[in-house]
Amino acid sequence: MAGIPGLLFLLFLLLCAVGQVSPYSAPWKPTWPAYRLPVVLPQSTLSLAKPDFGAEAKLEVSSSCGPQCHKGTPLPTYEEAKQYLSYETLYANGSRTETQVGIYILSSSGGGAQHRDSGSSGKSRRKRQIYGYDSRFSIFGKDFLLNYPFSTSVKLSTGCTGTLVAEKHVLTAAHCIHDGKTYVKGTQKLRVGFLKPKFKDGGRGANDSTSAMPEKMKFQWIRVKRTHVPKGWIKGNANDIGMDYDYALLELKKPHKRKFMKIGVSPPAKQLPGGRIHFSGYDNDRPGNLVYRFCDVKDETYDLLYQQCDAQPGASGSGVYVRMWKRQQQKWERKIIGIFSGHQWVDMNGSPQDFNVAVRITPLKYAQICYWIKGNYLDCREG
């Protein structure tokens, strides 16, 4: 497997970002682009000492590095990308491992993977996450809550939100289970909550004759078997590179039996339908309610989407999705293209500006998360 210079690796990252087919099969049909996807495969795994689970759960993260700051940051080298995409796995018994990865590119024939190698904080402010009129919608009634796409949103026992992305897998934000130094309290016994009717008769008690009242719901919990967190988050906590990797995957102990939403590579903001994104989460100012919102993307970098969707702590970890045309299957399909991370106050031309931020699923992140889910890179060739 021949190595290539680091400059060529940077060129590959750029090609992954822009080297795609035209996103429109017709002016009124925004279409999922086709990307040339890399492969991220484990190279070696070593055991680590058990963590102390001493961190306090953070329902949001903040950063002073805004769009212009991030745009001025150089793309990672091959060695840096390998370091950031290496990951820790935490198991239900408290043990953990660290896995180093290699980055590959599929050969044009599709018969195998070619290795690509090389030669070698802000001012504190009160956080405001509601912009003008509160445009969030609380979702009521089992006919909505238990149906797609709202049924893909789940609650973490640490207080965040997650999204079902496979039969046994939940995508969420890394800061919901790890503060960048160690795992948060309760992560060893992490559970995922699924909304279901509180009563078997359809949502109301036997003595409740008020048909206009919404059905009462409760959470049914499933334990988590293991979690994956990228080292880019763990090693990046001292600076703003960590926010680019604020995502984690949870594997449940048993299948959830609900329809899930697939992940996809995030298209450029200008190719999103209406330039908008959507997500649903369990904002902590509306306890027990699933809250849906949509809004325009205001800015973007290679790794982040900046928007002003109304949100509160607790919504962190929500899957950011869009609905676009799938040319191969000739149908519309929603996909998760990012993970809602948190809130930022940044300096914009000398004036403070606040944003809510989502981590984009880039081609490399897609390859990593897909491998965590599938365990076979050949099943991860369509982003």
From Swiss-Prot:
Residues 1-19 form the signal peptide. Keywords: Disulfide bond, Glycoprotein, Hydrolase, Phosphoprotein, Protease, Secreted, Serine protease, Signal. It is an enzyme of class 3 (hydrolase). InterPro entries: Glutamyl_endopeptidase, Peptidase_S1_PA, Peptidase_S1_PA_chymotrypsin, Trypsin_dom, TRYPSIN_HIS. One of its GO terms (molecular function) is serine-type endopeptidase activity. Belongs to the peptidase S1 family. This is Serine protease 23. It comes from Macaca mulatta. The gene is PRSS23.
